[in-house]
Amino acid sequence: MKIEPIALYVNDLEKTRSFFMKYLGAKSNEGYHNLKTNFRSYFLSFDDGARLEIMNKPEMPDLPKELARTGYAHIAFSVGSKEKVDDLTVELKSDGYEVISGPRTTGDGYYESCIVAIEGNQIEITV
C-alpha cells in the first residue's frame, strides 16, 4: 500500500505550483478546471512516483496555521544527501522563506531542516 496522492488546498495555485517545480523538481500536468464550480487543480509528480495534488476553489477561508496544531504537521521531501539539504535550505532562506529548524540531526537520527513555505504550511527537507 502507498499513499497516493497527498492533496493540499491553497489560495495561490500558480505560486504553489512554481514552488514545487523550482525547489523540489516536481513535474506538473496541464491542470484541471471545473467551469461549473471554478475548482482548479494540478497534479505534481516527483521522480520517485509520489504525487501531490494542489487545489483551489473560490472563497476558501484561510485560517491561521499554528506551527504546533492538530492535523497534518508537514510534508517531508527527501533530497538524497546532507549537502543537498544544506544547499536547498540556504536557497530557500535567501529567497525569503522562513527556516524554523535546522539543518540538523534530530534526536531520532534524521538530518533535516523545516521551513514555512506554502501559505503557512511546513515543508521538511531531509536526506
Name every feature range the model reports, one short phrase each.
Residues 31, 45, 89-127:
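Vicinal oxygen chelate
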Residues 68, 74-89:
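Mid-chain, well-packed structural core segment of small domains
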Residues 47-51, 60, 82-85:
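Short, charged/polar surface micro-motifs in flexible loops or helix N-caps
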Residues 29-30, 54, 59-64, 101:
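A short, acidic/glycine-rich surface segment
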Residues 9-51:
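Core segments of cupin and vicinal oxygen chelate
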Residues 38, 71, 109:
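Exposed loop/turn and edge beta-strand positions of beta-sandwich/beta-sheet ligand-binding modules
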Residues 1-15, 72-77:
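N-terminal beta-strand motif that seeds the catalytic metal site of vicinal oxygen chelate
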